[in-house]
Amino acid sequence: MGQKVHPYGFRLGYNKNWLSRWFSKKDYPEFVFEDNKIRKFVKKSLYHAGISKIEIERAGGKIRLIIHTARPGIVIGRKGTEIEKVRGDLKQRFSREFTVEVNEIRRPEIDAQLVAENIALQLERRVAFRRAMKRTVGLSRKFGAEGIKVSCAGRLAGAEIARSEWYRDGRVPLQTLRADIDYGYAIAKTTYGVIGVKVWIFKGEILDHEVEA
């Protein structure tokens, strides 16, 4: 059975950048574990903010977070109250100095992580999986995606035996390095068990292949 490499890891250093940017020898395992805990904490604290990814940079004892979100107003809050609360909670929990920046995602319909989370939410609300997949694919294509592939795996429609189904529209060239492929994964917790949702979105080709900031 053919195995698929992660589209992001496949392009690291070519036209994609690392989500954690720091260097350490003896503290490496601790920092990796801490980065994971920071991301989980921020996503949980700002669950309704539509957070796609969180970039982490470390310099000395200070940590810089760059939050990519579809709803910056929810992250920042009125007069910056929400973002200050999150920063204070992070400082108290991890005993480090944090600076937090917010980047707005202007077209969440073609952000793979947000699309995957949206499909997972629909499945949890008992929307038929084929309808959720087709509706999402159509919306992403309408907003400028050159191609999209969606895969759902688990006890689909409450079936006794778990299976996977996928739906694709347009081109999704996973093995082409210059292709700008966005990838997202989410889990839908249904009454029948968990359903894994994977989304690949092809946004066009990057010809100069410079690493994105």
UniProtKB/Swiss-Prot annotation:
GO CC terms: cytosolic small ribosomal subunit
Full protein name: Small ribosomal subunit protein uS3
A Pfam family: KH_2
Residue stretches making up the KH type-2 domain: 38-106
Matching CDD domains: KH-II_30S_S3
GO MF annotation list: mRNA binding; rRNA binding; structural constituent of ribosome
UniProt keyword annotation of Cell division present: no
Family of this protein: Belongs to the universal ribosomal protein uS3 family.
InterPro entries in the record: KH_dom, KH_dom-like_a/b, KH_dom_type_2, KH_sf_prok-type, Ribosomal_S3_C_sf, Ribosomal_uS3_bac-typ, Ribosomal_uS3_C, Ribosomal_uS3_CS
Reported function: Binds the lower part of the 30S subunit head. Binds mRNA in the 70S ribosome, positioning it for translation.
Any Gene Ontology biological process: translation
Organism: Solidesulfovibrio magneticus (strain ATCC 700980 / DSM 13731 / RS-1)
